[in-house]
Curated annotation (Swiss-Prot):
SUPFAM superfamilies: Anticodon-binding domain of a subclass of class I aminoacyl-tRNA synthetases (SSF47323), Nucleotidylyl transferase (SSF52374), tRNA-binding arm (SSF46589), ValRS/IleRS/LeuRS editing domain (SSF50677). GO terms for biological process: valyl-tRNA aminoacylation. A motif ('HIGH' region) lies at residues 43-53. This is Valine--tRNA ligase. Belongs to the class-I aminoacyl-tRNA synthetase family. ValS type 1 subfamily. Residues 1001-1032, 1097-1165 form a coiled coil. Gene3D superfamilies: HUPs, Isoleucyl-tRNA Synthetase, Domain 1, Valyl-tRNA synthetase, C-terminal domain, Valyl/Leucyl/Isoleucyl-tRNA synthetase, editing domain. It comes from Aquifex aeolicus (strain VF5). A motif ('KMSKS' region) lies at residues 800-804. Catalyzes the attachment of valine to tRNA(Val). As ValRS can inadvertently accommodate and process structurally similar amino acids such as threonine, to avoid such errors, it has a 'posttransfer' editing activity that hydrolyzes mischarged Thr-tRNA(Val) in a tRNA-dependent manner.
Length: 1165
């Protein structure tokens, strides 16, 4: 078969399209017992994916594809995050370029701009994920701001609010004056910065408010906040200030009226208080207390019932409480206040310091601690905190009660024939010497069976797959006494079959059970079978039994050290500020009653009919106004859905929101009729029509209004909360929200908890912890079993990738240049647990060469495969030792890869298949086969001709057999090239390699003796090749060599594989000698001394001289580099990449020098 050159772009486009069109990765109704579910960490709709996203998606896809090939029903849910602050920030920057701001546009128009941006970003990300080759189920795609998720968010908020776990309070928050919103503690990034510590003198006053001439000096880094001071605090154990506690001080500069948060006037004469939280060794030991602008001061202010005076507003400017400094920027005010203090001789001194300053994680603005009214989740409450710690620290127990049936068959010296309804029409005859008990399936009459014919490898593989598939089922067979089993086919006795029993997932040999107590054996499968009794009748009595299974559920962090990282944070948990003063996001579902002050939380639970629920959700989502026309509703519901444009918004409501198909008419006329009936008082007199009085009609505006009423006083005078929820609030619901919560859906029952979460360490607190909190609270179960925490992707010098530095590597550029398979394999092989990835573009180029190697190996196999290859297989010659060696290595590689992936050892798994394919299969086995592949058969000798053809067929059979399985092992890492090549193989069956079985180690294919022989052969050939290279003998030049050995094993290997040694080491001869011949250079290979004859090939003296010159040059260069790296000035001032480059040069020089010295030692010998 002809196979053209490798073209990554062509095959990637072809197979991406194929996978999506075939919906290969969609499982309509997954089986809970076989499922493997994963939810993608939803990328933000803020732009395109970076290399960190590519790594995350690759690591997930490797595991998902591997699990799918192991027989699991994999459901990997894709989706996107609306990313409140981040997305709003991106759109605001775009508006700024046009000279506009969101405040000028207003909320409604600004949100329209965001909705114009979001589809562009989402489509770009979806395209990138598709190019990367991820095997997600696009039919289940979700968005954190879609109708179903928005409904789930409102439900979660209401539930927590009614449970007293959401509250609204005055609190000190991290305020970003640029984004004008509160930030959680996790959204603040701290940086060490140079600053000043100002020492300010506060005059002490007497009981009449007159200065006493005494001062108390306080130290502060933020003099601008002193205008809001309401106390001075000292430690009660500080002897320096005990005499001042209880007295008052005059606040410097302030000679104007100040008001607290409730509008009460606050004096400029402030108390001196004692509090143990004051550090005696900071500054002077006396500190100013500004409860409205400092977290510790806030706590101290609450303890001592101090007034809260705000002096900085939401924009970072001084407010009316700042008097003479009002209107100034906070930093401008700082300078002015310091100057005034200096002028009034109240500034004692100024010290330069380095301190930690908090910045907004998004825009890098210095945050302003500020008291404001915010919404919080009480995550410190034991109802949330305790279980979130327990599921990670010790796990939780889950009990499940199952009902089974026991069928007790009383038989004695009796044969039972079990006809199997399988292809082949075989029967199993069970000859029972004693009573047998069958403990069988879920319903009466369902008998478990075990069977595979001897010698049929395909059925053996099928049986093993069944064993894996059913090992966790509640099917068991208990035998008392030892049955004898034979296989009947076509009513004639044939050779007794082999049989496979599985116990605890392990293969058992039935013969070894003799004399032991009865075993409970888990069967390979299930099936209905009639019992055909050949001698006597038997009585089977079904009996129901109940079995209670208890299993532990625990969230496991990988690597394990992240468990401590998580728990340390959880034990010191603070309540979570969830309100954000922005416009893009989930608007808090709270309506304040202007008449009675009641706080109302509305969800669609407040409505009965599907129409009303939908209209409420459209209003709450901002898709229509509270006043609307029926035409507006119809237009929205009939428009294509944002996430799934193949369906309408109404279809999305039916499938993803309510999960049932209401038969509803949503035309404008039908809605108008519905509203009219609802508001008509006469409707009460109409049989079958109920009145709800939900809608009102405004004849002037010609619009209908959905009426919301206060749940306390019934007033319609309500105002909705303007803040939106923190993005992470909706993201915390992701693992169960995507499966339809709060509805009790089949997906939710079958796919939750999910099996794996792959994420970066930087969002363990932001996201992972909160998913655990919300999952355990709402679902009463863990959200996922395994959390794999991957490291950061850095540049080759270990620096974080940054546009500022200019070291960002775009995954799309890499795919364009080297292909998605090269990108994926590079990221996987570099992923070592607990170690950051240092990424250089040459790495991708290297693994593109690997893809080429795979392609060319397949070309070699296919181009040498005749059209009648399959027909020739029955006549092939027995396997040679090199055939058995490569099959053994294949099985060992399969075992190593499986074990590595079970433990998320990506690098180890990738290295194993890389070494096998590149070295064992390509560099060695293909070379071994060339003698048989290209050997010409004599035309005049039919017997010899048949022998040559049959040996060629054996080589081709082994090449195909190993290639097909190796492609399957490679597939999770390199899906495109493996899919393309697999379909070209004659022994590949099925619509996709991704649905083929992942190879397992087969003990029957381990040929240890042949493996040892071929490994010894490789060592001998490698030793000869190495010395040839050192002697600089041309690869095409044939030379003589000889050997001496005391090892009988090595002697036999050389004799058996003499032709391979001559061909692959390019030798004229290789004979055994008793002593070293003259004019030879010696090398060793374990127990064998090898002599290469150099006469006529090498000028030894000249070669030694050449290597000595090379050694001298290396020593000089190494001396230069060492001198540079020992220079402290160079190490401090040179850029990181320059220092790293010099270190790499040093390492390379040392390796080269070592090699040259080893060669010289050999040559001089």
């Amino acid at each position: 078969m002809e196979i053209k050159e490798y073209n990554p772009r062509e095959i990637e486009e072809k197979w991406s399209r194929y996978w999506i069109e075939k919906a290969l990765y969609h499982v309509e109704k997954p089986d809970k017992r076989k499922k493997f579910s994963v939810v993608i960490p939803p990328p933000n709709v803020t732009g395109s994916l970076h290399m960190g996203h590519a790594l995350n998606a690759t690591l997930q896809d490797v595991i998902v594809r591997w699990q799918r090939m192991r027989g699991r029903e994999c459901v990997w849910v894709p989706g996107f995050d609306h990313a409140g602050i981040a997305t709003q920030y991106v759109v605001e920057k775009q508006l700024a370029k046009e000279g506009k701001s969101r405040l000028e546009l207003g909320r409604e128009e600004f949100l329209k701009k965001v909705w114009e941006w979001v589809p562009k970003s989402r489509n770009a990300i979806r395209t990138q994920l598709t190019k990367l080759g991820v095997s997600v189920d696009w039919k289940r795609e979700r968005f954190t701001l879609d109708e179903g998720f928005s409904r789930a968010v409102r439900k979660a908020f209401r539930t927590l609010f009614e449970e007293g776990l959401i509250y609204r309070a005055e609190y000190i928050v991290n305020w970003c004056p640029n984004d004008r919103t509160a930030l959680s503690d996790l959204e603040v990034e701290y940086e060490e910065e140079k600053g000043s510590l100002w020492y300010i003198k506060y005059p002490i006053v007497d009981e009449n408010g007159k200065d006493t001439g005494e001062f108390i000096t306080v130290a502060t880094t933020r003099p601008e906040t002193m205008l809001g001071d309401t106390a001075v605090a000292v430690n009660p154990n500080d002897d320096r200030y005990k005499h001042l506690v209880g007295k008052r001080a005059r606040l410097p500069l302030v000679n104007w009226e100040r008001k607290d948060l409730r509008g009460n006037s606050v004096s400029n004469l402030i108390p001196i208080i004692a509090d143990e939280r004051v550090k005696m060794d900071f500054g002077t030991g006396a500190v100013k207390i500004t409860p409205a602008h400092d977290p510790l001061d806030f706590e101290i202010g609450k303890t001592h019932d101090l007034p809260f005076v705000r002096v900085i507003d939401e924009t970072g400017r001084m407010n009316e409480n700042a008097g003479d400094f009002a209107g100034m920027d906070r930093y401008e005010a700082r300078e002015a206040i310091v100057a005034k203090l200096r002028e009034d001789e109240l500034l004692e001194k100024e010290e330069e310091i380095t301190h930690s300053v908090g910045h907004c994680y998004r825009c890098k603005t210095v945050i302003e601690p500020m008291v404001s009214v915010q919404w919080f989740v009480k995550v410190s409450d034991p109802r949330i905190k305790d279980i979130s710690i327990k599921v990670v620290e010790e796990g939780i127990k889950e009990r499940e009660e199952k009902e089974l049936f026991v069928q007790l068959a009383q038989v004695e010296e009796l044969s039972v024939v079990i006809p199997l309804k399988e292809e082949g029409r075989h029967k199993i005859v069970v000859v029972l010497d004693k009573t047998a008990k069958f403990l069988v399936g879920k319903r009466e009459g369902e008998l478990a069976y075990i069977y595979y014919p001897k010698g049929d490898e395909r059925t053996l593989e099928f049986a093993k797959r069944l064993a894996e598939e059913f090992k966790d089922y509640e099917f068991m067979v208990a035998y008392e006494g030892l049955p004898k089993i034979v296989v009947m086919g076509n009513e004639q006795l044939v050779e007794p079959g082999s049989y496979l029993f599985v116990y605890d997932g392990k293969k058992l040999d039935l013969y070894k059970l003799e004399g032991e107590k009865p075993k409970f054996l888990k069967t390979l499968g299930k099936g209905e079978a009639d019992l055909e009794v050949t001698q006597k009748s038997i009585q089977i009595k079904p009996e129901r039994i109940k079995k209670v299974e208890e299993r532990e559920k625990r969230v496991k962090f990988i690597p394990e050290h992240w468990k401590k990282f998580y728990l340390d944070w959880m034990y010191n948990l603070k309540d979570w500020c969830i309100s954000r003063q922005i416009w893009w996001g989930h608007r808090i579902p709270v309506w304040y009653c202007k008449d009675c002050g009641n706080v109302n939380v509305f969800t669609d639970d407040d409505f009965d009919r599907a129409h009303d629920k939908i209209i409420f959700n459209l209003i709450a989502d901002g898709k229509i106004d509270q006043e609307f026309t029926p035409e507006e509703v119809e237009k929205v519901l009939k428009s294509p859905h944002f996430v799934h444009p193949e369906m309408t918004v109404l279809d999305f409501y039916k499938k993803f929101v309510f999960h049932r198909y209401y038969n509803m008419d949503i035309t404008a006329d039908s809605l108008r009729l519905l509203f009219t009936q609802d508001m008509n008082p006469m409707a009460m007199l109409t049989p079958g029509v109920s009145t709800r009085n939900i809608y009102k009609y405004d004849s002037q505006k010609k619009k209908w209004k959905m009426v919301l009423r206060c749940k306390k006083c019934g007033s319609e005078n309500l105002e909705q909360e303007r803040d939106v929820l923190d993005t992470w609030f909706s993201s915390a619901l992701w693992p169960f929200g995507v499966f339809g919560w709060p509805e009790s859906t089949e997906d939710l029952k079958n796919l939750y908890p999910t099996d794996l979460l792959v994420t970066g360490f930087d969002i363990i607190f932001f996201w992972v912890a909160r998913m655990i909190m919300m999952g355990t609270h709402f679902m009463k179960d863990i959200p996922f079993y395994d959390v794999y925490v991957h490291a950061l992707v850095r540049d080759k010098y270990g620096r974080k990738m940054s546009k500022t530095i200019g070291n960002v590597i775009d995954p799309l550029d890499i795919i364009e240049r080297y292909g998605a398979d090269a990108l994926r394999f590079t990221l996987a092989i570099l992923t070592v647990q607990g170690r950051d990835i240092k990424l250089a573009e040459e790495k991708f180029e290297g693994y593109k060469h690997f893809a080429n190697k795979i392609w060319n190996a397949a070309r070699y196999v296919l181009m040498n495969t005749p059209e009648d290859f399959i027909a020739r297989i029955p006549y092939m010659a027995p396997l040679k030792p090199e055939d058995k060696w490569i099959i053994t290595k294949l099985n060992e590689t399969a075992e190593e890869v499986n074990k590595a992936l079970e433990n998320y050892q990506y690098s180890q798994a990738a290295h194993a298949i890389y070494e096998f394919f590149w070295s064992d299969y390509c560099d060695w086995y293909i070379e071994f086969t060339k003698e048989r592949i290209y050997k010409k058969a004599p035309e005049d000798n039919e017997e010899e001709k048949a022998k040559v053809e049959n040996e060629r067929t054996t080589a081709l059979y082994t090449l195909h057999y190993v290639l097909e399985k190796a492609l399957r092992i490679l597939h999770p890492f390199m899906p495109y090239i493996t899919e393309e090549l697999w379909h070209k193989l004659p022994n590949a069956e099925g619509e996709s390699i991704s649905l083929a079985e992942f190879p397992q180690k087969n003990e029957d294919e381990i040929y240890e003796e042949d493996k040892q022989k071929v490994e010894r052969l490789k060592e001998i050939i490698s030793a000869i090749r190495a010395i040839r290279s050192d002697l600089q003998i041309k690869p095409s030049e044939k030379i003589k060599a000889s050997f001496k050995t005391e090892s009988e094993f090595s002697r036999r290997v050389i004799q058996e594989f003499k032709n391979h040694i001559l061909n692959l080491a390019k030798l004229e001869s290789f004979e055994e000698v008793s002593q070293r011949p003259q004019n030879t250079v010696a090398t060793f290979s374990k127990d064998t001394e090898i002599y290469v004859h150099i006469e006529g090939h090498v000028d030894l003296d000249k070669l030694i001289q050449s290597y000595e010159k090379k050694r001298e040059k290396l020593l000089k260069e190494l001396e230069r580099v060492n001198k540079k790296l020992s220079n402290e000035n160079f190490l401090k001032k040179a850029p990181v990449e320059v220092v790293e480059k010099e270190k790499q040069i040093k390492e390379e020089l040392e390796n080269d020098l070592k090699k040259v010295e080893e060669i010289l030692k050999v040559l001089r010998s």
